[in-house]
A protein has these predicted regions:
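Asp-based, Mg2+/Mn2+-dependent phosphohydrolase catalytic module
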Residues: 2-34, 43-259
């Protein structure tokens, strides 16, 4: 039986609106003996709230089966003084990090939110200039992810990758990306399932973050035609998925027949 990593946003829901068949698909995969881990770059809400949201959509899982980037950040940055430009809800997942306004060892950027007023607060010029000053003072730059955009019910929205790139350019330093598509993030998920990458699948809607990162680690990949999926992406993508399914609902049958 396979180890299967499942993206969340765009696979199970868009802006909280369920994509049909998600709960049933997870139940079928479990019944077939596959080991599952839910992997998300969502940095808007805490792991607890994200797990509750999935359960409300009919997807059965334990909180510990959900791997989020804030939890990964807490592990990597444990014991450090961190200036965090993140959404307030994820602070509960940053256990072991000392959050500071100045004198930071690290600057951590989180993801954007659908509510414009929160983005205006977190990614204001004042806050970005403060982060730049800390980087100039010797702090290291970390990003929960570097996504360009994400799909919402009202259309594509700019994500935090643009702000990360701006700080990288201004401070002339690369950011360490903690979420997908980083090898460390996928490695942690595979370790949790005790799986060799060659025996694992990554299922997602994001060609760059989901499929590209997984393929670079040696995993096989499946693209869903929901969420961020665009037909023209098939023509321009640098990573060719091993499979394409209409939605998460079609995954169990496809996996069962895959070579």
């Amino acid at each position: 039986m396979a180890a299967i990593l499942l993206d969340v946003d765009g696979v199970f829901h868009v802006s909280g609106e369920p994509i049909d068949g998600g709960g049933a698909a997870v139940a079928k995969l479990r019944a077939a003996g596959h080991r599952l881990r839910f992997v998300t770059n969502n940095t808007t809400h805490s792991r607890r709230r994200l797990a509750e949201q999935l359960r409300s959509l009919g997807v059965e899982l334990d909180d510990g089966e959900l791997q989020t980037t804030p939890v990964a950040a807490a592990h990597v940055l444990a014991g450090k003084r961190v200036l965090a430009l993140t959404m307030p809800d994820i602070v509960e997942d940053l256990d072991g990090i000392e959050l500071v306004g100045e004198g930071a060892d690290a600057v951590l950027l989180g993801g954007a939110e659908e509510q414009p007023e929160l983005n205006n607060q977190v990614f204001s010029y004042v806050n970005l200039a403060r982060a730049f000053a800390e980087l100039q003072g010797g702090a290291e730059l970390y990003s929960l992810h570097k996504n360009r955009w994400w799909q919402t019910a009202r259309g594509p929205l700019l994500d935090a990758g643009a702000f990360v790139a701006g700080l990288e350019y201004a401070a002339d330093m690369p950011a360490t990306v903690l979420g997908k598509p980083s090898a460390a993030y996928f490695g942690a998920a595979l370790d949790a399932l005790d799986s060799d990458p060659k025996l694992a699948w990554m299922v997602g809607d994001d060609v760059e973050a989901d499929l590209g990162g997984a393929a670079a680690c040696g995993m096989r990949t499946v693209l869903v035609r929901t969420g961020k999926f665009r037909p023209d992406a098939l023509e321009t993508m640098r990573v060719r998925p091993d499979g394409i399914v209409s939605s998460i609902a079609a995954l169990p049958d496809w996996i069962d027949s895959a070579p």
